[in-house]
Regions:
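N-terminal Rossmann NAD(P)H-binding glycine-rich loop of SDR-like oxidoreductase domains
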Residues: 18-34
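SDR active-site strand-loop-helix element
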Residues: 21, 71-72, 121-127, 179-181
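Catalytic helix-loop patch of NAD(P)-dependent Rossmann-fold dehydrogenases
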Residues: 92-106, 128-179, 186
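Conserved cofactor-binding/catalytic machinery of classical short-chain dehydrogenase/reductase
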Residues: 105-109, 120, 164-165, 213
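NAD(P)-dependent short-chain dehydrogenase/reductase
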Residues: 155, 167-216, 223
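Amphipathic terminal alpha-helices
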Residues: 294-309
Length: 309
């Protein structure tokens, strides 16, 4: 069978032919499992590094994808024998290179190539580029940051770089679906899972925030890519939830003996290398597409009822 015939068969059998970058990561692996279970779309795991223009171009020419998805991002890493599980890793000496390469250059390069090749591009970005202010009051579920809002949080190298990436994705625009997630949550213990993180911290700074329950949202991501939806979306569950509220549910459904201790933002800042983003993202745009999306408190409660340690 020649290559042309093979490609015709693929397009007839599958709705999407997806080239996935960042497939080795926690979220990338979840997407792969979803695509396998749906058995509706063909997917190819990228072998080229996303920061290598010529190799990526070569792979696109060979694979001929209908869609590219990027789950590339740098939020943690290892230096010597020390494991950094948070964005404080990017504040260490010499890590500005990793930050810019993985959180800006690579996804923007993919976005530009997708425009050039007229390929739909799904970019999983972040909403950790905002913070409460006078126009967006603390712990209030009105006047949240919208998809049109520009970043106003510059307290960490991570958020600064990702904020510029977010703005560049808007400028490239044509074929790009830019999804802003926050504090991702699933129903299984994992060092990247926000529930796992806060249940292992010595002290908790409890702040109401927008958050993303991936168990509910990732199927929507695939559906949006399949329907070639473009633009920026705040990709969080509607509403606000605090660390303490999550831990109270954890204690109720998962571990009745669990205890924790709180401390203030000021006390937290003394032990962190960088500040943390706290905000409320307006989700009306996403809710118009998916009106059945659960409120964050309901979604987290459902997660806790089936939580796997």
């Amino acid at each position: 069978m020649n290559k042309i015939s093979y490609n015709i068969i693929i397009y007839l059998l599958y709705y999407m032919r997806v080239l996935i970058f960042g497939h080795k990561g926690w979220i990338g692996q979840q997407i792969i499992q979803l695509l396998k279970s749906q058995n509706k779309h063909e997917f190819i795991l990228a072998t080229s590094r996303a920061d290598n223009l010529e190799k990526v171009r070569e792979e696109i020419d060979i694979v001929k994808p209908t869609n590219i998805m990027s789950f590339i991002g740098r939020t943690h890493g290892k230096i010597g024998d020390k494991e950094y599980t948070t964005i404080d890793y990017l504040e260490e000496k010499g890590k500005i290179y990793d930050n810019v390469r993985d959180n800006l250059y690579s996804p923007v390069l993919l976005g530009l190539l997708c425009n050039e090749y007229n390929i739909h591009f799904t970019y999983l970005g972040t909403g950790c580029i905002f913070e409460y202010d006078k126009e967006h009051p603390y712990n209030t579920q009105y006047n949240g940051f919208t998809e049109e809002s520009n970043p106003n949080f510059f307290g960490s190298g991570y958020s600064v770089v990702k904020g510029f990436t977010d703005q560049l994705m808007k400028l490239i625009n044509k074929n790009i679906l830019n999804l802003r997630i926050r504090m991702p949550i699933t129903d299984e213990t994992n060092s990247r899972n926000f529930i796992t993180k806060i249940t292992t911290y010595n002290k908790i700074c409890s702040v109401p925030n927008s958050m993303s329950v991936l168990t509910e949202l990732l199927p929507m991501l695939i559906d949006m890519a399949d329907n070639k939806i473009t633009g920026t979306y705040n990709f969080t569950n509607p509403g606000l939830i605090s660390h303490n509220e999550i831990l109270e549910m954890y204690k109720e459904y998962v571990d009745k003996d669990f205890t924790w201790e709180n401390f203030t933002i000021e006390e937290q800042n003394k032990i962190l290398s960088a500040g943390r983003s706290n905000n409320y993202l307006d989700t009306q745009k996403l809710e118009k597409l998916y009106p059945d999306i659960k409120n964050i408190k309901d979604s987290v409660r459902d997660i806790m009822k089936n939580y796997k340690l």
